[in-house]
UniProtKB/Swiss-Prot annotation:
Domain ABC transporter: 40-267
Similarity comment: family membership: Belongs to the ABC transporter superfamily. ABCI family.
Source organism of the structure: Arabidopsis thaliana (Mouse-ear cress)
Keywords of the record: ATP-binding, Nucleotide-binding, Transport
Protein's name according to its UniProt entry: ABC transporter I family member 10
Superkingdom per UniProt: Eukaryota
Amino acid sequence: MNGHCLFAASPPRLFPLRSISSSVSPSGSYRIKFSDNVAVECRNLCFSVSTRQGISVPILRDCSFRIPSGQLWMILGPNGCGKSTLLKILAGVVNPSSGTVFVEKPKNFVFQNPDHQVVMPTVEADVAFGLGKYHDMNQEEVKSRVIKALEAVGMRDYMQRPIQTLSGGQKQRIAIAGALAEACKVLLLDELTTFLDESDQMGVIKAVKDLINAKKGDVTALWVTHRLEELKYADGAVYMENGRVVRHGDAATISDFIKAKQSSYIDQIGS
């Protein structure tokens, strides 16, 4: 996993919520659904910010793509291309300036830095944390959900472990289990392997891939990454540059496209 780092990693970002609900902006909108068998879809999505001088700076420009249900997709592109902003909009943390968005619910955001999300003293308590809002759920059902979620990410035997004894990759898997315990349909994953060692990187990727395969269409994952070698685990990908979706489709096609761009760039430097 140390191989080809496609783009430089960005620093960690902190968001305040684990489970996120969509909101609606005055211009952009969140749709109930565009079509069947689609978990995520954007149409002509734009997002801009204003400077102190009142100048509008575009961050996302006319982005359109769709992700089928039950698949693992990745978003790749250079630093500053809009990957994380796009993920925040899909999560409902940021409203689009214009365009339309559909993300199947429930959806959950898993942070780049697990220490921003995994905060309870034990594994069991942390995975159960998000279930506290379901006041009609008894303790037996809570425990059953926690066990099933931990089994899905290969962490069942860690249920009583203190959080501080876990590695970074294990904490990421606990964060994913917390999302699964809430029966989420879409996982939004922000550069989960950026600060992990090789063993932890593989553990997290395998957990997500195994989860998607085991759920058989019930869970979809969208993973922001800067590592080209991670793309081989995906079903499809979105490649971005300068706030635009340049290509989207099956993982092999996007991988070939990126490698061709890299080769062309190297040839230009050498000429």
